[in-house]
Amino acid sequence: MVYIARIRKKVKKLIKSIKPVSIIIMGNDFENVEDLKNLIRWIFSIYTKDLKIDPPIVAIDQEGVNVSRIRDINYIPSNYALGKIDKKNISYYAGALTGYELNEIGIRWNLAPVLDTLSNKENFSILERSFSEYVDNVSRNGSSFIMGLQDFGVSATAKHFPGIGSVFEDPHEKLPRDLRNIHSIWNTMKPFIDAINIGVKSIMVSHVLVKEIDQDFPISLSQKSYNLIRKELGYDGILITDSLDMKAISTNYSPNEIAKLAFLGRADILECVDPELAEDIHENMKNINLNNSKREERLIKLYLERKKKFIPPKEIIQIISYNVPKWIRRKEFNPDRDFYIYYAGSTAYMNNIIKRIILKLRELNFSVKEFNENESLNNSQIIIIGKNLHLNGNYIKINEMCKNNECIFINTGIPYDSELLNKKIGYLAAMGDKYENIISSIYSILGLFYHDNF
C-alpha cells in the first residue's frame, strides 16, 4: 500500500513501478470530494488502461474528529464522544453513515476504527481516537461501528493490535515498549477478539514492542505476533502493518529487514506513506517468495456487498454533534456584552472553523471579536478553544490571561486537563472539533442552548 502525493507525474511512475494492491488517500491529496472522485478515476485508469491489470482497492483513514481525511462529508465528533454516549445503535449509525459516504465516493476500505483502550492519559497519539478508558466500552462501541461500516460495503480495520493505549511513546517518533504483564495485554486485546468474532475484514498491527509477545521485534515485524493472530485467535482476514515510514520502524530497521520480517512474518499488506521508502522496500521484496494464495483470497474479500439499501439520515450526526458537549464547570456569559474568542492552537482547519463561527455569531448580531494574544484586556469575556493542555502546557498562559478576565474554556479533546485551569475558569468539554460541537458549546455559554454536566 502506498500514499498518493499531489505530484501526479511522480505518482504515476511510482504506481507503474510498484503496482500496489491498495492505495491510501491522505487529506492533502485532494481539494474537495469532486477532486477526490477524479483522483480515484485517474488512479484506476493507470491500472486498467496503462498496466492492464485490476485496479487497487482504495483506502483511507476516516476515523472521525482529528483523523478525518475527508472534512467535507459527515463525520463523527470523535470515538471518545461515541464512547461517552455509549449506545450501540448510535455507534452503528456512525459507522453506517461513514460507510455510506465513503462507498459513494469509491472508497471501499476504511483504516478504522481505533480499538485501543485509553489506559494512559498521556498517550498523545491515541487520546480521543479511543472510545474509552474501559475495555468493554471499546468492545461494544467499536464492534457496532465496524458492523455499520461493513453493512454499507466498506471494509473496516481494527487497529492498532494488540492495543497501544497504555504506552507513552508515539510510534511516529520512536519505538514504544509495552512492559505490561500478559494478563493486562490479553485484557486490552478483547476489543480485537470481539471484532474478529463479528467478522472484521482487516486488522492493523502496531509498531510497538510488546515484551510478553516478542522481546526482540515490534508487533508489525514479529512472526510470533502473526502466529498469535492466525493460530491462537483464528483470524483469517487481512493483516496490514501500520505505516512503515514511522520512526519506530524506519530508524531501527533497513528496507531489507522490513521487507523480510514483515512479509515472511505473514503480513498481507505493508503500508508505507513515504514514496521513496516504499520503493526501497519493494526493491528488497523482489528476492522474497511472495506466492501466497491465501493473501489473494483475503484481498478479494475486502470488496463487500452493501447489505443495507437505505441511506443513513445525515441530520442525526449533526444532532449528535450539537448535543455531545458536557459541562465540567458551568458558567455563562452575558450575551449583550462584547466577548472574544481565542484559539489556543495552530491548525489551519480549526482557524477556519473559528472564522466561520465568528461570522455566524455576527450574523446573529453578537458583538464578538477574535482575540489577539498581544492585547491586554481587563474585565472582558473570553471564550478559549483548545485541547490537551496537560500535554502542551498552554494552561499556564491561559491561567495568566484569565486573571483579570471572565473566561470559559472549550476543550475539543478529552477533559484530562480541567484541574490544571483556575477554578474560576468555566470548562465545557466539546469532545470534538466539528463546527457543530463548537457552535453549540458557544450557544450554551451564551445561555441559548443546554448541555448536561459531565
Question: Model-found features: residue ranges?
Answer:
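Short glycine-enriched loops at secondary-structure junctions
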Residues: 3-6, 58-68, 108-118, 158-164, ...
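Active-site-adjacent structural elements in enzyme catalytic domains
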Residues: 34-45, 87-106
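Second-shell residues forming the walls of enzyme active-site clefts
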Residues: 2, 7-10, 30-52, 67-68, ...
